[in-house]
Amino acid sequence: MASPSSHLLFLVLLCSIPSSYLTASTIPVSVFNTIPHSDPFQRLSHLAFTSIARARHIKNAQNAPTSTTHLFPYSGAYSISLSFGTPPQSIPMLLDTGSSFSWFPCTKRYVCRHCSVSSTGISSFIPKESSSAKILGCMNPKCGWVHQSFDPNTSCQECQLQKTNCTQICPPYIILYGLGSTGGIPMVETLNMPHKKISDFLVGCSLFSSGQPAGVAGFGKGVSSLPSQLGIKKFSYCLVSHKFDNTPKSGFLSMDPESDSNKKTGNLSYTPMLKNPVRAGTSALSDYYYVGLRRITVGGQKVKVSYQQLSPDSDGNGGTIVDSGSTFTYMNQAVFDMVSNAFSEQVKEYKRAETMESQTGLRPCFDVTGHDAVKMPALTLHFKGGAEMALPLENYFFAVDDVQKEVVCLSMVTDNTLLGPELISGPSVILGNFLMQNFHVEYDLTNERFGFRQQSCS
């Protein structure tokens, strides 16, 4: 069986070109690694822990005096390389469909604490070396994109006194996420795409971070997201398998500026994107892509998950979102227990690997030592409209090679007491990128539908 020691690199994709400027295109790029652990058990445990931390942050989404994104460090996430400034500076940024605000490490004095690499080894944008870099003004409407409750009449007092040529800047941001934070100054800069320059692109110039060595390219549904600022009507990606994490292989990201209003991509199964719930006093849930997961089957047998768990209520409790920034798929305790128990009850050929379960926090795990071909019950997700996602084994079981034995673990997580009591609010299911390996995934923003098909992405 393949060793997991290479399973946790950050794979790099490069996006194509924005709306109304070009036709869609794709460009492959290289890989980089910031995983802090070399031991496979520590790596697997770390992924499980950070997947839970990210899920807790997504579920606890709320407006605050500071801007918030939904990212955690060392997640096994995928990234894109974007070029900003005049002359251009290329910066790797994590592809995140669970948040909208984009930011990058900024200035030569950028400090990253509790990171796996030193601050000097992190790619940072240098505003002084760009003639097009501008700090965002306080009266600029985009300041309200950063601070959702922002009121320029009360926050920009200097500009109220000095109506013309006001130099007051948009307030700094503090971004909170599952296991850390980042902070900096909002700015507008030229985004350099392969054949076009997009001026005045809103991006955060982060001066410090904790536990976050790379910036974020926000692909959520908010007005500050990259697709929204570029007017993209459709974007898609294909995530290469994590087994290629130690190779130059990469997937791709494509952004389509000229999407036909009704045309479907060949051989894709589609399910409607659901209307985002509105939690009282907050618009934080508006970034997420909700889809209608209607049924889960294990080995062809329906898992008896309640409708209330799979459908969001008016307060944003329950439902399913797609999140490229999460590694392992998260399920609320009630949903997870039914799914994991279904595997435990149906798998009779292999013994439970309880030591591995205690070491990693994943369950169930099975000892498959001596078996050339591992067989597990099929896992299928059934969506609204009839779309079915039949998953290959590598997308829902993680292989761990020990010196003495070979073990596979269900690559899904649920909340636990390590980070406090379980949060029952927010989405019940968060579909992570491990589940989407070797799937062509499409976000049709015009028609509000989510499409997918299985294919090789390498």
Task: Name these PLM-found stretches.
Residues 2-40, 74, 85-87, 95-100, ...:
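Aspartic protease catalytic domain
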Residues 99-102, 109-111, 209-210, 243-245, ...:
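Solvent-exposed loop/turn segments at secondary-structure junctions
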Residues 99-103, 216-219:
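FAD-binding core of FAD-dependent oxidoreductases
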Residues 106-109, 226, 336-343:
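Short active-site loop/helix that positions an aromatic residue
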Residues 162-170, 178-288, 403, 407-457:
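Aspartic protease core domain of the pepsin/retropepsin superfamily
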Residues 179, 195-196, 300-302, 386:
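Detector for glycine-centered tight turns/loop "hinges" at secondary-structure junctions
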